[in-house]
Amino acid sequence: MKVAVLGAAGGIGQALALLLKTQLPSGSELSLYDIAPVTPGVAVDLSHIPTDVKIKGFSGEDATPALEGADVVLISAGVARKPGMDRSDLFNVNAGIVKNLVQQIAKTCPQACIGVITNPVNTTVAIAAEVLKKAGVYDKNKLFGVTTLDIIRSNTFVAELKGKSATEVEVPVIGGHSGVTILPLLSQIPGVSFSDQEVADLTKRIQNAGTEVVEAKAGGGSATLSMGQAAARFGLSLVRAMQGEKGVVECAYVEGDGHYARFFSQPLLLGKNGVEERQSIGKLSAFEQQALEGMLDTLKKDIALGEDFVNK
């Protein structure tokens, strides 16, 4: 199984590469690409870690050598948020980067499963889909927006609030991956109940957690380490499912039946070819139902922005 990380010299990319080097199954190949000249050196650095994962690094304008034979491609390339920016301010720079990289994927490894980490995910996934469609290689079961950071944050914050072990809490998060489009389904956590105020406060904290990190880093970056962990969790789940492990479920942002929006994050059963089954979002509380209805306009606008960027 070959995994390629695009944007591997950045804060997320390096953290992700480290976790994949130490956690991918024995015999896997890890391929690192970034425009930055340091990238082959990042691979050399990681190659000294004693695991049975072969690693190579590539830099420059052309990602082709890194993509050849890739089964999974994780895209973390792009600029990070600074204080005062929201994820959509990133659009102008990151849209072009994602478009370019996905065009190269469409040429070199069109069968690969793709996980898009680059923000704004609500929009960059739509860009990726349209690029793949234009190239005639789009498979909606193989393109994912990685929203796992919202899930791990939810797990952490709920565990803190309720005095539970963070490893025992699993919160489904649906919708999108910015602001009001992030909807943690707090009503669906077994054996945990919340007051209305706790639900309102927790939901808001989960939605604004990225800003919390941006502000705490005081202009020195955004959430890179927790995002690296989240992306690794998603990538490793995908690899395990593609290698035949049964019952692997992760939430991610994918094209579904369009019931809520063309792209929507929901629980997915993963399999050998990506998404095996889009699972139901289950029964929502009144608060969740209202939040869901309230986000759809924003989500649809974010998606249209990406579609128009490719098709204009």
From Swiss-Prot:
Active site (record annotation): H177 (proton acceptor)
Catalytic activity from the UniProt record: (S)-malate + NAD(+) = oxaloacetate + NADH + H(+)
Entry EC no(s): 1.1.1.37
Annotated residues for binding of NAD(+): G7, A8, A9, G10, G11, I12, G13, D34, N94, I117, T118, N119, M227
Binding site for substrate: R81, R87, N119, R153
GO molecular function: L-malate dehydrogenase (NAD+) activity
Keywords assigned: NAD, Oxidoreductase, Tricarboxylic acid cycle
Entry-linked InterPro entries: L-lactate/malate_DH, Lactate/malate_DH_C, Lactate/malate_DH_N, Lactate_DH/Glyco_Ohase_4_C, Malate_DH_AS, Malate_DH_type1, Malate_DH_type1_bac, NAD(P)-bd_dom_sf
Highest taxon of source: Bacteria
GO cellular component, one term: cytoplasm
One family name in Pfam for this protein: Ldh_1_C
Listed GO biological process terms: malate metabolic process; tricarboxylic acid cycle
Subunit structure: Homodimer.
UniProt xrefs under HAMAP family: Malate_dehydrog_1 (MF_01516)
Similarity comment: Belongs to the LDH/MDH superfamily. MDH type 1 family.
PANTHER family named in the record: MALATE AND LACTATE DEHYDROGENASE, MALATE DEHYDROGENASE, MITOCHONDRIAL
Function: Catalyzes the reversible oxidation of malate to oxaloacetate.
Stated name of the protein: Malate dehydrogenase
Native organism taxonomy: Bacteria, Pseudomonadati, Pseudomonadota, Gammaproteobacteria, Enterobacterales
